Structure formats: structure tokens, C-alpha cells
Amino acid sequence: MKSNSKVNINNNGDNHNQTKNNGTNGFLPNSLKFISTCIRTASSGVRSASASVAASLSSDSHELKDQVLWSSFDRLHTSESSFKNVLLLGYTNGFQVLDIDDSNDVTEFVSRRDDPVTFLQMQPLPAKCDGVEGFRSSHPILLAVADEAKGSGPIVTSRDGSVRNGYEDPLALSPTVVRFYSLRSHNYVHVLRFRSTVYMVRCSPRIVAVGLGSQIYCFDALTLENKFSVLSYPVPQLGNQGISGVNVGYGPMAVGARWLAYASNSPLSSSIGRLSPQNVTPPGVSPSTSPNNGNLVARYAMESSKHLAAGLLNLGDKGYKTISKYCQDLKHDGPGPSLSSSPGRKVGRVGSHSAESDVVGTVIVKDFESRAIIAQFRAHTSPISALCFDPSGTLLVTASIHGNNINVFRIMPTPTKNGPGAQSYDWSSSHVPLYKLHRGMTSAVIQDICFSSYSQWIAIVSSKSTCHIYVLSPFGGENVLEIRNSQFDGPTLAPTLSLPWWSSPSFMTTHFSYPPPASVTLSVVSRIKCNNFFHAASSVVGKPTFPSGCLAAVFHQSVPQESQSSSPALDYLLVYTPSGHVVQYKLIPSLGGDQAESNTRNGATSGLTSEEELRVKVEPVQCWDVCRRADWPEREENICGLTYGGRKNAELTVDTSDSEDQTKPLEKHHVYLANAEVLINSGRKPIWQNSEISFYPMYPPDSDGKNLNSHQGGGETEIGKVSANEVDIRRKDLLPVYDNFHSVYTSMRNRGFSGERDSDSSSSSDPGQVKEMHPFNGMVYPEDEERRGSAHFALTPNQNPHTGIVTFKQPVVSISSAVKDTDYIDDDAHVLPKNASLPAETKIENSSGISGDSNVSSNRSDMSMNAADEGEGPIDGSPNFEQFFEEVVSNETVTETEHKDAPSDGKLDDDEDDDMLGGVFAFSEEG
């Protein structure tokens, strides 16, 4: 009766027979109901207002924009010594390549409408090989992972956040095709088809790695022949509803100059990299039988308490996992896949759980030239979702599916001799943990990772569209930022310059073996967050704002250098936002607290600041709306005919013998030495190696103000009116070469930091770039003509002032190649024009006319990894440590594990069972 009375009171609000207590109990629910109604009304009004404001942010509707599935920044290599920074966008109906190298000329290279594209990657210019042309004449080449079975249509994905509203039936993608698109001929010159989903692609001048669900195929970068394959840990399924094979984060695979890193599917070896447990007491001894049972009782009590604590923790962990799994099942009570349903996972058995716990989070680093495993270690206790090398190829970044902490390791191979002619590696000492980057307490998938040129800055982009910026030292240590006192600019923050812990100055007669620094946990110094509501509110009041959020990032300066800047920038960052804009940010030092107090505390010399003061502000400078619209025409720019600074540049085209559109090479300019410094190496860093020093080759202008191909000589010229191209200095001391770090001091005594390199020592596979700069005032440092590299090209658009659409002339380029006998199916008819479909019966196509001598069953293990034949690199920006590294080429034949996706054929040898035979390949993956 009491419950009925309450119902009547709540429903009617009138009952004179209620008691005092009942009246009180009825008043509270009514009050709470009234408050909840007010909150619901207010929130509904705010939601509708914010929706209307967000809808009015752009003049054109979101329906006019093509839906983005993939976004990333990459480098379009125009020669061995130069490249351009480009933005790659994959859509539900094709892809787009934009030149973002210069802020004054952001244009489209390619805009093609085709099948849905879920992954894009530019292939670097392959290393030259005598007598083998391969696909070098077709470069630059773009790799596009597409789904041929699905046409363009509505797709729901959180990879890039560009999701259309109003669609209820999402399209599930399963991309199984890797297409090689030539930016010279604007055709697909090669196609790889697989039976299972392709999740990621990584490229280097040596190999092209294609990552499937639980297997990785590695192809030769020059001939695109299958070299080997490895089994990997199953790729975590992290996609949203309706998506299969699209949103897996950055991807658990990384390719460096010589090494391949991937998630292992096998546990660590019991004899290497692990400690064996020891018994506390001898067998058969108990506290009651031992004469000195007092100490044993205490010891057993301590051990029992440890086991009890471990059991409680294990029980709590199992309970947490059970509740989490229950909530996860409730959350995924729909068409979307859950994390527990990842391929290859086994649950419900104790043995399988134990085996999986030993495997999960393990990383393998493999030398893809000698095919030896040089390092194997456990980086996380959860499945790995992201692996990335720095520009040097020796720093490895790892992240798990939770993304709370990102680990940074330095890979240092330690060769060991097991017998005559046999060589292996000590996995326990082949890696050094340097940093743990703390992102946050909540879980998020890592979507993008990028390093600066000197590996001092790193940007981590999460699935929440937030960019986390960290500063670190390439050689570890907790001192990552320091205050530098300048006579003109005053105190400012700057990254700390450090040297390797294994090196010793040349003036030291005694070698000291220093241990590596301890691992340090670093916090973010700045963030770029997604704040759409603030952006909408600012637009309402008429305050101009920049688009927020970040989906992809790269450290690059596309805007001209500010001559009158109150605070000099530490670095520049380009980001792609969820709204389809590219925003240029600059990193500005921010000193916390009172400046005078900071100077007093640190003294006259530069010192370290506290953690609260180690902050960096990000300031937006400029933005561009680059997302493709539905009414934009397709673009196919002629890469060979591009000019740069009014000059034809022959180095922009790949050095091939059959190219008919090569331009006349530049005539040599007069080179002047602006400044020289002769200094005996004493262990300190030379002035010219500081990050503030830049080098610029000059091109004298003619009477009309344009640059000439040759200098006529005579007269005077103002320095401020001369266009100059800044040479981007790259490190050369961080290359992944074999080195025994414990015995290098014998050669260091006589050579020091800078010495003459051997002819077969590795050079940088990431050469410097030459980027256009505006006229400036000040001293310039011209460089030698042979080391200057090629100037970047820039498109000259014809813009319609009425429509605002940029159009370009499209010269017709015809490429003919003789058809030869080869193991591939070689047919010029299979080169696809735009809007053409690929033949369904052809598994792998090739239209570049590969010589018959390059068959698919030949493994090029004799290809040297030395990059000396790639031309001379740019000026070093740091002390040269290459003479400390001694390359050891292993002749050991590594037998690859037999995989399930490679086709079987009786003609293949046992050590060639992972090669593809003929031109018709079908890769499959079971499980």
C-alpha cells in the first residue's frame, strides 16, 4: 500500500491522507525531476545551438566534401638528394596528393577518382643496382591500398574523423590490393593482390613491406620481387562499427634503413634475454627439519606473503578483466567487432592464456639484408599497435593498444660468435630503453608518429584527434631542455645537445666504458587538442580561429622565416585537422614563473628548469582548406616538366636512359667561401654544427630579377635580393650498421669525432632536401655545386578568379617499353588508364618490362646496404660518429619460416619457399 501511495503521489501530486514522511519522500523526487527537466531542456538548447553554429562554420556543406579514409604526410623523392613534402589523402572514391612544401604554392599533384583507398605511402627512390633497371624509370611511385570489391559510397570510420552524417548502413571494407601508381605516367605500373586484408605498407630504398593480419611480405624495392616473409602477431582489430581492416592505428610494423621491426608471434627464448629462477632453499629442506629454523620460518613467511600478494593482485586483475570483458561485450552488442574477437586469439584455456601472455607485446628487429634477428625484447604487456623508426633508423618507438605510455628504445646490435663462421646476436643487450612518454590516463589508439630532423622532437597523434609533443635526446638522459642565455634575445629554451654514451673524445688516452643512461619518463611539453565547440563559439562572436584537432603531423616549415619575430620558433609543425584543413604551427619556448627568479636560480650559465617550466607553446600561423570537393576535377600533373624558381631542373627527373623529357642540366655557378673555421677536435661541438647555423646556395638574378641558369659575372648584387635555397642538414651518425660498441675505442684514439670514412661505410639513406626561401638579409653560406642537391619544383596554377578552382595543363606523356620474356605477366594492355578496372583474372601485373634475368626465385642477398652509390649527402649537422661503426656482413644463410600465404610449387627450393612463382600470385591467410 505504501508503494501504491507513492505512485499516486508522484503521478497526481495530491493526496491529503499522506503522512509527513511520505510528503518529504514525494517532494525530493519531484524536485529532482524538475531539476533534471531543466538540465535536459538547457542541454537540448545548447546542443541545437552548437549544431546550428557548427553547420554554419563553412559556406559549403559537408555533403560536398569527399569522405576521407586516410591522411598522412610523406616525402616525394625527386632525386637521391632532394624531396618534397606532400600530403596524402585517401577517399572513398580515390586519392589525392598535394604539395605542401611551400606555403605560397600549395597545389595538387594528383587527384584521381577510383576505388576506396584505405592506406597511402610514397615509395622512396630505390637504390641503384648495376644491370637492373626495374621500376626506377617509373618513379616517383605512390602505393595505394584499395578495395576492388567495393565502389564509392558511405563509410563510417574513426581513422580520420571525416565522417558524413545521415547514413545508417556503413560499408565494410576489406582492402586486398596494393597498387603502384606512377606519378610520371599516371598509370598503375604494378599490382599486388592478396587473399586477406592488407593493413599497412612500409617502404625504404631497399624493400617494400606489406603487412597482413598475421604475416608480413617483403619485396625488393627495385624489382618488386618477393624476398622473404615473416609471421607476426595478429593485428589488433580496433575499428568502429562496420569497418574491417581500416582503423588499426599506426600499425605494428616499422621499416628503417636496414631493419624491419614487427610484433612477434613467438615468446622470448628461454636462454637469451631472460633470467632463470633460483630455489630459495635446497630441495627437501623445510623449516621444521632445518636446525636453524628461525631464519627459514621468517624467509618462508616472507615468501608466502609475496605469493599471497601476487595471488591477490592476480585475482583482482582477473576480476577487472572479467568486468571489462563483460562491459566490452555489452558495448559491442552490435555489428561492430570487439577487441576480444581479434584473429588468432585463444581464450578459455589456461595453457593458451599462458602462452599468449608470453608472446603479447614482444618486438622483433630483423635485418632484411642478412635476414638475421638482431634484437628481440618485450616492450609492452598488451598487444602492440604502433611501431616507428626515427630518421636515423636506430631509435624505435613502440605503443600498445591502450596508448597510455609510448616507449623509446635504441637498437644496438651486439654480435656474438657461436663457432667458426657462425654469428648471432645477444638479444639481451641489443636494445636500450631510453624513454617512456606518458600520454594520459585514458586509453587511446596511436594514429600517427613523427620525428623532427634531428630526432629531438616527437609528435604522437592519438585517436582523440590530439597531438602530443615531446622533446627528447637521441642518446637518452633526463636533461632534454635547457635555458640558453643570448646577448640579444635573452634566456630561451632549447633542446639539449648530447653525445653518445659509448663515445670518447680523441684527446683521451684511456677508454672509459660508460653504461647507458637509465630510462626516463617524460611528460608532454605541449598539446594540440580538438576543440570544436570553442571554434564554433568563436565563430559566432566573429573572432577568427584556426581549425583544431590533429589527424596527421609532420615537422616542416612551409611558411617563410619571420625576420622580425619577438620569440624565435624552436621548430615548425604541419598538421591535418578533422575538418580537412592543413594548419602550420610553430613551437615557441615558454619559460614558467618569474624570469628574474629563474635566472637567479640557474646562475650565469644555462641550467635546467623544473618540470613546470619545461613547456612549449604552439601557435598557429596559417591554414589551408585542402579537402577535395565532389565537383573538383581530376588532376594529373606532369612531374617531369615542373620548374623551380624559374629554372628547369634536370635532377627533378629520375636518372634514366630512356626518358625523352629530360632537361638540360644546370651550368655551374661560381662558388664563394663565406666563412671557414679550422679547429682541432677537442671534444666540444663546433660552431657550425649548432642548429642555428644554416647553409644557403645562392643563385644570382639577372637584370629582369629572375634567376639565370648561369652567372654572367660583373657588377654588384644586393644580398637581400638574391633567392637562396636552404640546405636541410641531416644526421649521418645514427645509421643502423653493425658495430661492437665495446671495442671501438681502439680506432677512436686516432680518428676522433671527424675522420675520413671508408669507401664502403654506410651513408644516409635519408638525404637532405633543398627548400625554397624568400630573399633575406644577412650572411649566406653557399655550398659546393655537387653537394647542393636539386631545387624543389613548384606548380604554376592557372586560377579562375570567378570559381576559385585551380586548373593545370595536362601534357600527354607516352612511355613505351619492350616486352621481354619474364616470369611476370607483362602486357602493356594491363596498364590501366583512369576510371578503368583491373583484370580480375590477373593476380599480379607488371608493365614496366623487367628483364628476364630478374626472376622471382632469385633472392638478392648480395645487394649491399651501403648507400655510397646514392651520391654524396648533404652537410652533416652533428659530429660524425660513422667511423665508430664497423659493418659486419653476415654470410649466414637464414632459413625463413614457411608461411601459409605463399603459393607452393615443386620447383622451388627449401630456402626459396616464400618466393612467388611466375606472374600469377595469390596470397591467402588462414585463421
Curated annotation (Swiss-Prot):
Repeat (WD) residue spans along the chain: 379-419, 441-482
Membrane topology reported for the UniProt record: Peripheral membrane protein
A cellular component annotation (GO) from this entry: phagophore assembly site membrane
Induction: By sucrose and nitrogen starvation.
Stretch forming the signal peptide: none
Keyword entries, A-Z: Autophagy, Membrane, Protein transport, Repeat, Transport, Vacuole, WD repeat
Ranges of compositional bias, category Low complexity: 335-344, 846-859
UniProt feature, compositional bias: Basic and acidic residues: 896-907
Tissue specificity annotation: Expressed in roots, flowers and leaves.
GO BP annotations listed: autophagy; protein transport; response to starvation
Disordered: annotated span: 1-25, 333-353, 750-788, 844-927
Domain notes: The first protein part may form a beta-propeller domain involved in specific binding to phosphatidylinositol 3,5-bisphosphate (PIP2), leading to the association of the protein to the membrane.
Similarity section: Belongs to the WD repeat PROPPIN family.
Stated role: The PI(3,5)P2 regulatory complex regulates both the synthesis and turnover of phosphatidylinositol 3,5-bisphosphate (PtdIns(3,5)P2). Required for autophagy.
Quaternary organization: Component of the PI(3,5)P2 regulatory complex at least composed of ATG18, SAC/FIG4, FAB1 and VAC14.
Name assigned to this protein: Autophagy-related protein 18h
Protein encoded by which gene: ATG18H
